[in-house]
Amino acid sequence: MSETLLSSRNLAFELYEVLDAEGLTQRERFAEHNRETFDAAIGTARSIAEKFFAPHNRKGDENEPRYENGQAILIPEVKPAVDAFLEAGFLNAARSFDAGGMQLPTLLSQACFAHFQSANAASTSYPFLTMGAANLIESFGTEEQKQRFLQPMIDGRFFGTMALTEPHAGSSLSDIRTRAEPASDGTYRLKGNKIFISGGDHPLSENIVHMVLAKLPDAPAGVKGISLFIVPKFLVNDDGSLGKRNDVLLAGLFHKMGWRGTTSTALNFGDNGECVGYLVGKPHHGLSYMFQMMNEARIGVGMGAVMLGYAGYLYSLEYARERPQGRVPDSKDPNTAPVAIIQHADVKRMLLTQKAYVEGSFDLGLYAARLFDDTTTLATEAERKQAHELLDLLTPIVKSWPSEFCLKANELAIQILGGHGYTREYPVEQYYRDNRLNPIHEGTHGIQSLDLLGRKLAQNGGAGLKQLIRLIADTAERAQAYESLNALREPLEKLVARLQTVTLGLLTDLAQGKVNSSLANSALYLKVFGHTVIGWRWLEQAIRAEEGLTKGNAADVSFYKGKLQAARYFLTWEVPGCHHELAILEALDDVCLNMQDEWF
């Protein structure tokens, strides 16, 4: 039977040949695990995803949540799927044994989650949002807040959301208008409107805990005046039982292009002046707290984009193998049988492009998860700091590159299916629609590019960038052991050298106050930087593939040769094109910056 969620062989390659998941078991936190426990968790995830999540993916798309009597109504299949996820323990996959968790490395929890993201992005989002909200309370909440709200979330009784966006303030959070007035009992009364709140209402849990950004009456202007509040759908009594309904109203549902099975809500807080909220942490520190959840979410968005691209790639690959159509160009006999379309060179190009984008992104997402483990479990503080600096630098790439290029992979999957791909009878058009959200939410491409070029590169004296350059150089040096990899290594080394020169120039211009011109083409910089990182990850995979071929396992020869061909494609077809964009960046080209609105 063909695999539809992801390639189990490729996952094993990443975990055990590229990223050394077993090496993590040498660390104290993961010492009770081994490859058997890792594989058991992955097997359970695959089984639940196939049995409970994948079967209603299309139905959830065709039957959006409905707004009835102030509530959101979902199709009945969502609840059993989410319950199966909870019962298997995946909500607390990374949490410690003492807290009732599986104490898995983040690398392994992300490997497990990938199956759910591929099977059904919409239904998966409900527990995923809850994990992020719970982590936020765990990091910054009081002991009372943890007992009242966090523990029921860990138990799967309460779910969570992230409530940031307002009708007039999307990316520009400094302009939010939701207000929080202090009450005599130490709580706050919130008033305002939030939109596009995923999971803002549903019947899947006893309660919903909204993490809400708002401003206090004495708040400073801008982002330094934003505070964070816990606002439950139902108030919680001191004994843990549910109290009365809080003054949070579901005002309506948005009807989306994709991701239709997830409620996208408009929420009104405090229409009756009785919306109770609880301040999290210090006043005016809300955005810095929320960024923890947002950074986690951005990595999750990147992996979600990967898995939708992966699902489309696998489906179009199977289709191309089974669909007979036409004959190869040198076939002169019209009586010969049509060949499977995978025999046509242009179809191979589209499949190879998908493979390069999807498997390159998959490697990067899991590498980021491995880095997250390093930030918490490496032996020394200096090592943990290094890992954090690198992860911080790579986060905009982990979020944005798969969101752009795995969406392109979905487009190619549709093209391979031809007319069938354009119909709703085949799943690839839904994968595209679902994936189109990922370049938008949790920080658009433009926001990510400004974050990378305007902030992350120079952070801590450029420590993250210097570390990345050293890692790429190390990979290139190890690649020299294989003559066949010279043609792959050299384009990457040329790109890295050119990127360093252009980056230094841009950072110098920024330091000299040329802010607008230096950042005007930041989206191009994001793309080139991303191609550099993905090129590095493909060269690393190519080295591991060569090592695998050297071991001589006949059953894996085709797998490893496929890896080498995809690496060759990306490093010799995609990477060289970045030099044109670097020239535009170096020149501080102003064609976009100086375009006037009346000229359009």
Where are these regions (language model features)?
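A glycine-rich, basic-preceded beta-loop-alpha segment at the flavin cofactor/substrate interface
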Residues: 196, 235-251, 256, 266-297, ...
